[in-house]
């Protein structure tokens, strides 16, 4: 068991940002092993993975722009049918949390919405590769780059 798995072990509701999913889908040379470890954890009994429709948007924009509708469909299918990850809509309570997070930390709106929804759902960890989110204190921000040499 690696350090990422040890750090995630204490979290039963884990929110996942877009990048770890893209690394998994694209089998990214550097980050794929970390994404695999994350999804092993999400497959554990009593562990719930969540993400939001923001991830659907962010993941599908580039392939849509490239005319890769096959990838758009595959990413949508993966998110909608995943047994390890539940995709949430953004509701008013999550948006209100996002307002506070954006005001306090100056983070981008999509990140604030993702974290706001995570907090509203009871997540205690947010897995990302965006170091700018490390300052958020309301949730444990797990940054993939922190687990690489």
Language-model regions: role of each:
Residues 1-51, 64-73, 77, 131, ...:
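Short, well-structured N-terminal submotif of metal-dependent ribonuclease cores
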Residues 2-5, 36, 85-129:
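Active-site neighborhoods of divalent-metal-dependent phosphate/nucleic-acid chemistry enzymes
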Residues 12, 47, 85, 124, ...:
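A structural micro-motif
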Residues 62-63, 122, 137-141:
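Short secondary-structure transition/capping segments
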Residues 70-71, 75-97, 103-105, 110, ...:
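Short acidic, glycine/proline-enriched helix-loop-strand junctions
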